Amino acid sequence: MSKLWAGRTSGEVSSIADDFNSSIRFDCKLYKQDITGSMAHAAMLGAQGIISQAEAGQLIDGLQGILNDLESGALEFDFGCEDIHMFVEQVLTQRLGDVGKKLHTARSRNDQVALDLRMYLKDQIDEITALVKDVLSAIVAQAEANKGVIMPGYTHLQRAQPILFSHHLMAYAMMLLRDLGRLGDCRKRMNVCPIGSCALAGTTYPTDRRFEARKLGFDDIARNSIDGVSDRDFCVELMSAVSILMMHLSRFSEEIILWASWEFKFIELSDAYTTG
């Protein structure tokens, strides 16, 4: 498949430059979000009369077929494509002909990848949040089951004051509650739809940005098109929140290791969760 931008150049691109620019080996993880976003875009194009409703239906059905085939393993990624967007469009055009080329109307890969990233990270936040809630519930259950159990409290691994085991456990519950708050705040700021920003300054097509935002579960649209496609602060914010979460989990894990050691003997771990 020719490059989307091939019409702007006349010479051959170096294979070294091609390999350097290729991102499909890692952005293939975005396939589900890329296809879901494209289905919403096709629906919007049809609703706005930019393409016919019949063409929109063909595009949506074709995209669903690609998603199904990727999920089942019937279709494999072509790592010769530059990125996940070009791979999906290539397969769609092979299956539908010229109708497949209309999918990219009123859209750029700039706002497309910004959309994919936000959708992917929102999904990741939802998964992480569910797991943290499971850990939190387990900690609270252990605290409830061990009310009244007294243990030494340590500073610098020196016994300092007697404390309740449940009180020590609930310290981690408090940390995880703050972690959940950070994840939720991050998701809220991330939940802004950039689609329609195009390369950086929108499009002359009569698009409906809110149509796509609603269809994809976003709370709002990006109010500035340059900000919508160019900034990745939401990625850094999530990395910060997850780093703090992992620090808390690492700290808790180290406590469990100490408590289960021969020197402490405060707890016993099931053989199901230990190795030699």
Across the structure, where does each feature detected by a protein language model lie?
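Acidic, glycine-rich loop-and-beta core segments that form the ion-binding/anion-interacting portion
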Residues: 216-276
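A helix-coil-helix interface module used to build multimeric assemblies
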Residues: 1-202, 207-211, 275
